[in-house]
Amino acid sequence: PMKEVSIRGQGSLAYPGLRTQGNLETLSGPNDATRGLTSLADTFEHVIEELLDEQQVIQPSKENKDADLYSSRVMLSSQVPLEPPLLFLLEEYKNYLDAANMSMRVRRHSDPARRGELSVCDSTSEWVTAAEKKTAVDMSGATVTVLEKVPVPKGQLKQYFYETKCSSKGYAKEGCRGIDKRYWNSQCRTTQSYVRALTMDNKKRVGWRFIRIDTSC
């Protein structure tokens, strides 16, 4: 969804434009607010669908032959990305809208002290360079070297990975939040998913492979 324009010889990131249909400040009454939230959620669903469709129709060429190798958590750039991946932000905001829409229906029946929402496990997210990762495990279970730089027509770009892991300051050691410790044992653990990255195996063969990175807690 987020494409690195540097692949085509530019030096910045390209983000598709986003337009929402109204905002909460222009709404009046609970019914209008509910319709507004639904409209915003539908808008972001439409944007996500357009982004996915756009990614699927990208055709490799001599100038952007690697454009189809991007993941929402992998970025090729000449500098550290300043923001999380676009699709990641869209999913986070849509989840917020869904939660807000649900809380509006139950708010009048809820105790004010219980209206706040907390995650079961605390997590942190940040961009990590290939130099920091160094190695990773691919889909076959083999350990491969993650290459720091990717060659492009007009130079080289660095590989960045947006990783999410359990926070060391949260409930990782004390158990999951909301679990009754008198009856249950729980633990927050970092889980991984596969993303595609440029790597080198133990036989010095360089290629794009799916590797595991930390993606949730």
UniProtKB/Swiss-Prot annotation:
<dbReference type="InterPro" id="IPR002072">
    <property type="entry name" value="Nerve_growth_factor-rel"/>
</dbReference>
<dbReference type="GO" id="GO:0021675">
    <property type="term" value="P:nerve development"/>
</dbReference>
<feature type="disulfide bond">
    <location>
        <begin position="166"/>
        <end position="217"/>
    </location>
</feature>
<dbReference type="GO" id="GO:0048812">
    <property type="term" value="P:neuron projection morphogenesis"/>
</dbReference>
<dbReference type="GO" id="GO:0038180">
    <property type="term" value="P:nerve growth factor signaling pathway"/>
</dbReference>
<dbReference type="Pfam" id="PF00243">
    <property type="entry name" value="NGF"/>
</dbReference>
<feature type="disulfide bond">
    <location>
        <begin position="121"/>
        <end position="188"/>
    </location>
</feature>
<dbReference type="GO" id="GO:0008083">
    <property type="term" value="F:growth factor activity"/>
</dbReference>
<dbReference type="GO" id="GO:0008021">
    <property type="term" value="C:synaptic vesicle"/>
</dbReference>
<protein>
    <recommendedName>
        <fullName>Neurotrophic factor BDNF precursor form</fullName>
    </recommendedName>
</protein>
<dbReference type="GO" id="GO:0007169">
    <property type="term" value="P:cell surface receptor protein tyrosine kinase signaling pathway"/>
</dbReference>
<dbReference type="GO" id="GO:0005163">
    <property type="term" value="F:nerve growth factor receptor binding"/>
</dbReference>
<dbReference type="GO" id="GO:0043524">
    <property type="term" value="P:negative regulation of neuron apoptotic process"/>
</dbReference>
<feature type="propeptide">
    <location>
        <begin position="1"/>
        <end position="108"/>
    </location>
</feature>
<dbReference type="InterPro" id="IPR020430">
    <property type="entry name" value="Brain-der_neurotrophic_factor"/>
</dbReference>
<dbReference type="GO" id="GO:0005615">
    <property type="term" value="C:extracellular space"/>
</dbReference>
<dbReference type="GO" id="GO:0050804">
    <property type="term" value="P:modulation of chemical synaptic transmission"/>
</dbReference>
<keyword id="KW-0325">Glycoprotein</keyword>
<dbReference type="GO" id="GO:0030424">
    <property type="term" value="C:axon"/>
</dbReference>
<keyword id="KW-0339">Growth factor</keyword>
<feature type="glycosylation site" description="N-linked (GlcNAc...) asparagine">
    <location>
        <position position="101"/>
    </location>
</feature>
<keyword id="KW-0165">Cleavage on pair of basic residues</keyword>
<dbReference type="InterPro" id="IPR020408">
    <property type="entry name" value="Nerve_growth_factor-like"/>
</dbReference>
<comment type="function">
    <text>Promotes the survival of neuronal populations that are all located either in the central nervous system or directly connected to it.</text>
</comment>
<keyword id="KW-1015">Disulfide bond</keyword>
<comment type="similarity">
    <text>Belongs to the NGF-beta family.</text>
</comment>
<dbReference type="InterPro" id="IPR019846">
    <property type="entry name" value="Nerve_growth_factor_CS"/>
</dbReference>
<keyword id="KW-0964">Secreted</keyword>
<dbReference type="InterPro" id="IPR029034">
    <property type="entry name" value="Cystine-knot_cytokine"/>
</dbReference>
<dbReference type="GO" id="GO:0030425">
    <property type="term" value="C:dendrite"/>
</dbReference>
